[in-house]
Amino acid sequence: LMGLPPVVAGLLIYLLLSRSGPLGEFGLLFTPAAMVVAQAMLIAPILAALSRAALEELWEEYLEQLRSLGAGPWRAVPTLLWDGRFALLTVLLAGFGRASAEVGAVMVVGGNIEGFTRVMTTAIALETSKGDLPLALALGL
């Protein structure tokens, strides 16, 4: 899913949440909840891969020390999380950056409805398409 284009992810969620889709009875399409689902689908693989890489590196570094102290996997996890807290914070910031820069999936499932589902990135896209570049630039800053 990490390489899935955002518009395709939005289309898949659209198909799931549309009235004829399996989750259509919940009426989530064109709501902020649908936008959150789209964002979660896009950033979850990135968060998982980066977190795994960070913690796997620590695991390899601390494995012998933890075993010599008699720590099993469940006792090692808090140590790894504590020592990897800055790496995990960086992972969360990377996920936030990815989510906040997203336009495609959010526009497909949210609809860019003024006052309801319009967010900064979709507003920038709208103003750019209308030719109001000064406003689009101002929104970006």
Question: How should each PLM-predicted stretch be described?
Answer:
Residues 25-28, 72-76, 80, 112, ...:
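Juxtamembrane loop-helix boundary motifs flanking transmembrane segments in multi-pass membrane proteins
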Residues 58-63, 67-90:
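Amphipathic cytosolic juxtamembrane alpha-helices at the membrane-cytosol interface
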Residues 1-56, 80-103, 127, 136-141:
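Membrane-water interface segments at the C-terminal ends of transmembrane alpha-helices
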Residues 109-141:
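Interhelical loop and adjacent transmembrane-helix boundary motif
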